[in-house]
Amino acid sequence: MVKSSFISIISQEDKKENKGSVEFQIVSFTNKIRRLTSHLELHRKDYLSQRGLRKILGKRQRLLSYLAKKNGVRYKELISQLNIRESKTR
């Protein structure tokens, strides 16, 4: 996806770019995760990229749990738009 489409997904009623918002960070982490996953399918022994992927997954998980605590409705909407699974602990 393109960065402008991420911004439109996040804040359709808000027309300004808010790159510090939790939703924007989750979307950008999801984009990085998808790129790293496709990279690791070709390069299975790239252990530094695997480590980076695990770190980004942890950051995204922490942000998702924060968003779920603060606003459950936005959490559900974001998960459905990004086609990612809901957290097991929720």
Swiss-Prot record:
Subunit structure: Part of the 30S ribosomal subunit.
GO molecular function terms noted in the UniProt entry: structural constituent of ribosome
Record GO biological process: translation
Subcellular location: Plastid, Chloroplast
Primary localisation category: plastid
Cysteines paired by S-S bonds: none
GO CC, alphabetical: chloroplast; ribonucleoprotein complex; ribosome
Alphabetical UniProt keywords: Chloroplast, Plastid, Ribonucleoprotein, Ribosomal protein
Protein name as annotated: Small ribosomal subunit protein uS15c
Membrane-traversing stretches: none
UniProt similarity note: Belongs to the universal ribosomal protein uS15 family.
InterPro entries xref list: Ribosomal_uS15, Ribosomal_uS15_bac-type, uS15_NS1_RNA-bd_sf
HAMAP family, alphabetized: Ribosomal_uS15_B (MF_01343_B)
